[in-house]
């Protein structure tokens, strides 16, 4: 079914560099010690929890998505993009709850004729693509770092997403010949978000950091896969998933 895999290098890819969550010797830190290490490092790097969380997300996905051929690289980036996009929406909801306001307050809500609900708005676009530490900024920066000389047209993806609301084409990535993921972004989001949210909450903490956790995960995966999948293609796959999944109502997927 799939045509491109990490293959024999999967074992190496599944071993992120040493971090406070993975001490020398390869064993896991006791949970209390891990959280204490994160709390201490936050004094120097406020993003440390999100960075460690990103590594943990990639490690878990590599384990979950591996079969006898390895890990299908396009599927990994589609999944990470879907999670990163929805994390932007979930982050805004989480921040609203902390402030004691309606979780829908940050959004412009669009209801379509097919009975579905979608979420838009400047705060959502900011977390996804417009802020200095947006998902797009971090992922595109990694792509350039690993040699990408061109980037996808993010505005075109936004426009195509909006025009597909209420149709069967919503959330269907534009095909890149030879680089199809194994499932649609919504399928990855539906199955993976509930499984990964607890560890993201634990390691990243503040809802503001949830999208960054997945953006750092994209960076981590891009570094691992740069010799298997061109960084600009990895970035395109991720953003083709992230933008529409930032708009969806998770409970209806």
Show which residues each predicted segment covers.
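Solvent-exposed interaction surfaces and binding hotspots enriched for charged
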Residues: 2-253
């Amino acid at each position: 079914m799939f045509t491109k895999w990490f293959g024999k290098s999967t074992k190496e890819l599944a071993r992120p560099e040493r971090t406070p969550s993975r001490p020398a010797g390869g064993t896991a830190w006791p949970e209390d010690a891990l959280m204490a290490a994160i709390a201490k490092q936050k004094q120097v790097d406020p993003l440390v929890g999100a960075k460690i969380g990103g590594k943990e997300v990639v490690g878990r996905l590599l384990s979950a998505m591996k079969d006898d051929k390895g890990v299908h690289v396009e599927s990994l980036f589609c999944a990470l993009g879907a999670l990163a996009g929805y994390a932007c929406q979930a982050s805004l909801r989480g921040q609203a709850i902390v402030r004691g306001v309606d979780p829908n307050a940050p959004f412009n809500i669009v209801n379509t004729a097919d009975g579905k609900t979608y979420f838009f708005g400047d705060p959502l676009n900011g977390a996804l693509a417009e802020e200095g530490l947006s998902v797009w900024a971090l992922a595109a920066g990694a792509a350039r770092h690993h040699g990408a000389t061109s980037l996808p047209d993010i505005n075109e993806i936004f426009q195509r997403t909006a025009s597909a609301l209420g149709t069967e084409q919503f959330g269907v990535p534009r095909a890149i010949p030879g680089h199809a993921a194994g499932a649609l972004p919504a399928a990855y989001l539906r199955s993976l978000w509930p499984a990964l949210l607890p560890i993201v909450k634990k390691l990243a903490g503040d809802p503001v950091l949830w999208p960054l956790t997945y953006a750092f995960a994209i960076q981590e995966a891009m570094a691992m896969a740069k010799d298997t999948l061109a960084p600009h293609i990895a970035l395109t796959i991720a953003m083709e998933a992230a933008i529409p999944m930032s708009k969806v109502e998770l409970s209806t997927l």
